[in-house]
Amino acid sequence: MDTEDDPLLQDAWLDEEDEEVAFSSRKRREGALLCGKSSCRVRPLRVTLPVSGFWNIVGWIFTNPYCAGFILFLGCAIPAVLAVVMFLHYPALDIDISYNAFEIRNHESSQRFDALALALKSQFGSWGRNRRDLADFTSETLQRLIFEQLQQLHLNASHLQVSTRAKRSAPQGRTSSPEPRAHPHPGNETSRVTRGAPRWDYSNTYISANTQTHAHWRIELIFLARGDSENNIFTTERLVTIHEVERKIMDHPRFREFCWKPHEVLKDLPLGSYSYCSPPSSLMTYFFPTERGGKIYYDGMGQDLADIQGSLELAMTHPEFYWYVDEGLSAENKKSSLLRSEILFGAPLPNYYSVEDRWEEQRHKFQNFVVTYVAMLAKQSTSKVQVLYGGTDLFDYEVRRTFNNDMLLAFISSSCIAVLVYILTSCSVFLSFFGIASIGLSCLVALFLYHVVFGIQYLGILNGVAAFVIVGIGVDDVFVFINTYRQATHLKDLRLRMIHTIQTAGKATFFTSLTTAAAYAANIFSQIPAVHDFGLFMSLIVSCCWVAVLFTMPAALGIWTLYVSPLESSCQNSCSQKCTKKSTLHLAEDLFVASEGTSRAGRETLPYLDDDIPLLSVEEEPVSLEMGDVPLVSVMPENLQLPVEKSNRGHLIAHLQELLEHWVLWSAVKSRWVIVGLFLLVLLLSIFFASRLRPASRAPVLFRPDTNIQVLLDLKYNLSAEGISCITCSGLFQEKPHSLQNNFRTSLEKKKRGSASPWGSKGSISDTGQQDLQGTVYISKSRSKGRPAIYRFSLNASIPAPWQMVSPGDGEVPSFQVYRVPFGNFTRKLTACVSTVGLLKQTSPRKWMMTTLSCDSKRGWKFDFSFYVAAKEQQRTRKLYFAQSHKPPYHGRVCVAPPGCLLSSSPDGPTKGILYVPSEKAAPKARLSATSGFNPCMNMGCGKPAVRPLVDTGAMVFVVFGIRGVNRTKNSDNHVIGDMGSVIYDDSFDLFKEIGNLCRLCKAIASNTELVKPGGAQCLPSGYSISSFLQMLHPECKNIPEPNLLPGQLSHGAVGVKDGKVQWISMAFESTTYKGKSSFQTYADYLKWETFLQQQLQLFPEGSALRHGFQTCEHWKQIFMEIIGVQSALYGLILSLVICVAAVAVFTTHILLLLPVLLSILGVVCLVVTIMYWSGWEMGAVEAISLSILVGSSVDYCVHLVEGYLLAGENLPLHHAEDPTACRQWRTIEAIRHVGVAIVSSAVTTVIATVPLFFCIIAPFAKFGKIVALNTGVSILYTLTVSTALLSIMGPGTFTRSRTSCLKAVAGVLLAGLLGLCICLALLKGGFKIPLPNGTAL
């Protein structure tokens, strides 16, 4: 039974009101005021009869120490028991750090494209070392199968010649059967069986005594070139750096225990020192070969760098080469900004019988081993090379370490709030403990519901925000109960005081928790997994937190009043007497300091820091609200007196209160129309800019942009052939050992040709002969007063007078090494010219200069000597500069670096430039290794470069048959980059049975010029002319459309072959869709493709496997991610707005009070979105979450202002009652006076609580914190300006809330909802399609 329905309880309330009237002496000086509909009783009945009914039982339970203690025990025991049950009897709850959590993986477009990509990956991953071209492989295999089919068709024919030819062709085709079928390729196993899959995924493995023969784990390395404008990774310095990093990895003390040891490595003799571990899968195998027994082994174990261009030419003859480089490298442009490497590790480990033998134990050992590389790899980057490292286990380790470090910042936020709780509970340890405990224990209950009831196995990485947010939300509820209980000191009966606390605080916290939980719950409808899980988890936490506080805090307050409060008061009084010189009365039962002697002498202020309940300080007699709410009045118990001196806190809040009063007097009275005008202008501009916020064009940035893992994730989308498993792509597997003799000409031939071999070995010139090819240019100078120094160049070390030796330093070069004849890459000829023109013979009889041309005899220059240098940087070279002065006597100079040789401002030319000479250390005093500068393509060349494989699916539309979909049921989703799943094949698909229908469909699609560009049909894979053979199978296959491909370009059409059967086929078509169009425009093209294909498929007979075909495109996947992301955000925003509007309508019960709230929310949301647009953000997952939360968090401040407006109307002065304008302004000013300090303090504390989020490495945390702080600042600004101005203009003057108005509001909300439903039904009946959050339409 409610208190307002009990006359006895009303008399008790009136008794307390009479005491309040007696206490407030200032009230009598201000005259009579309007007291509402209730009459003021001077002599209320003093009835102390107990309350009966439900609330009497509730009050007795929470004030009985045994019942209250039992409730506290249950509040702690139930969450603990649920947590134990969850952790012991259910699968472990892990952190979902998958990048796929931010992609819409369950949509049809994603499933189709992933299925095709996996099928291509499986087919491409089956390359053998002797079959490097997928197009030739598939073409030959398909040709063989066609021959076999033709043989079967003509088996009973009478033409013996044709039959014999078919029989000869069949065995010939079988000889080209791919090696991987007979010998399962390790690459195929690795690409499907990695990422910590459970043991039942290893059905293809076999028990073997050989350890570490199966490649199961890997470390991914990417080396980025930096430090110059060219950013070419193929330079001497960068390649040496990369080689050193790879050698450091192999030199790890425990590397041999985990490395991969394939049987092919046993043939590589130099790897014996590494226990025949496989070297990194890297291009370093070409650049750093080793020489053993007159043979070159491409294993990357050499100490010296081979010839860069020659090694590149050799590597580019294999299509696997393109896996290591970026997309820009080609035969014409042999430059790459990056290089990829993989370090492979094998299973089973030593002392394990097989891969399946104690698999989890093996995996745990490897994880403990591989993380020891992190510290070393983090220090390997140089000014020229940035080293990025990753891989499944390193990714997971780095993400979890980052996540844990960021969670430590949550402790800083929680600690600050805990201190705030301790202060605002009057330093009560008991209340502070149970307040924080109720929040923490509610999280365990929410976790149980999330994991057990809803069956979600992983916590999304975004859920870490809950650690920051929930403490602030829960503490607000705790403050509400404590403050409401503290304010009810006028209720002497403890039971009545507890009932009043539960009713008032429970309603207030229910309203705010409902709007907050609804804002988070709106994200449940999002198709982005991370957003969906975050919305569910946060809504559960907010709801559980409210329930926990609702039961825990009243019980704690009951025990605190009976037993703990006296002890805390005596302790605090004792400390106060010892620590202060002046005797002050400690207000242990108040959270406010009254201000005296101000210009507002008749008013008292409550400095609350909470924004969830109406904080009203009125001096008039309060009137009970008909809704059952009891106004929170500021009263002083009779036994207390005000302190003589005000504290600093009182001064601060008094100043803030005075500032707010002056502010609202300006905004609500003097400049209200100006504010409204500015608001409408800003609103229109905000709507314009907010509408320009574009959907995200990529998955969100998960980490700070400069971190190792984020740079690596960004590169994931730009790497060549990312989907290919390429563990055998290095030179170790692609090249057999080469004989060193085959690459050398005799020294006599080289001398005749004027060149020499850059390596010393058998069959090459001797070390002495090589030394004879080198020479030294000596430099001396002559200097006289007032004249510039003249430099002399000579091949003779003697220095005649008046020349002097040049000392090192200041850019001077005493001498440098050169080659007398062209040697290797030292082929740039420089000529030293001498002249006597314009010189004084006594000081410097001659002058010298250097030029790349011949000496200019017309100007007096004569030939002295010539030598050879390198035009580009080489191994063991140093860089020098030469230049000719543009002033008399026009002499030349060689120096170490500018500005010494910048004698002229002209660009590089014949007499000015850069030369690379052998360094002094490189002088061949000792024998060089056989591989130093080795050029494998010197004699016969290495052949033509391989064509870049086009297995990446660009803007093509693929029509696929033989694939039903993708199976993701057994995937482990807690990896940064996890597996996409496995392909579900259509076993009923038979290529030769459906060949006629396929040819007919290919022609039909190719002839549709609205969808396909002319010449854009690629129905068959590249290679031999398969179309000519297809004509023999079916007449429909005549005149198959031929694609317009560039010379050497491969077709995007693909065929999957397994066990001698065509498993699936993919026809590619170059669509007319322009990729630059918006996603919503491209969606129309998708519908055209889907409609046309379905029409064609329906023409096939019933039961045909072709009816299961589908069309897919990577572009469709991208546009649906954008469309569904935006639609999910909009639906979340609309749902959150509807719930908030309904709740506010029921709470305010008046349309003119609802309208200012709605306008304020609209203004806040639009302005925040506009700032997001100005900041360059896109509508991604984090922004989608924020949009819905903005509504729920924006509504609090303005609603509390409206609540203060309503409560002020209960005590409206008589002289304002007849003037609506004055009445609205007075009520607005009173509302700000009563709740202004509270909402401002709450906003400040909210912003401060989000500051630790700014420093998080996880980017969504930092962005979420910025959005919450921004929204809080804009919301409080709009509340103090726009909301006050709108209330003073359109607020109802004399309206007071009643039960009747509440029922009308509920009826209005239900009617509006029914009307909206009817409109939707009418639109659907009229043929209008309503888009749904999942991308479909009703």
Curated annotation (Swiss-Prot):
Q: Where in the cell is it found?
A: Endoplasmic reticulum membrane; Nucleus membrane; Cytoplasmic vesicle membrane
Summary of the tissues where the protein is detected: Expressed in retina, hippocampus and cerebellum. Expressed in the ganglion and bipolar cells of the inner and outer nuclear layers of the retina and in Purkinje cells (at protein level). Expressed strongly in brain and retina, weakly in testis and bone marrow.
Q: What induces it?
A: Down-regulated by thyroid hormone T3 in retinal ganglion layers during the embryonic development.
The segments labelled Disordered in the record are 164-196, 747-768
Topological domains annotated Cytoplasmic: 1-67, 428, 474-517, 561-672, 1150, 1259-1266, 1324-1338
Residues in the Lumenal compartment per record: 89-406, 450-452, 539, 694-1128, 1172-1237, 1288-1302
UniProt-recorded name of the protein: Protein dispatched homolog 3
Identify the coding gene: DISP3
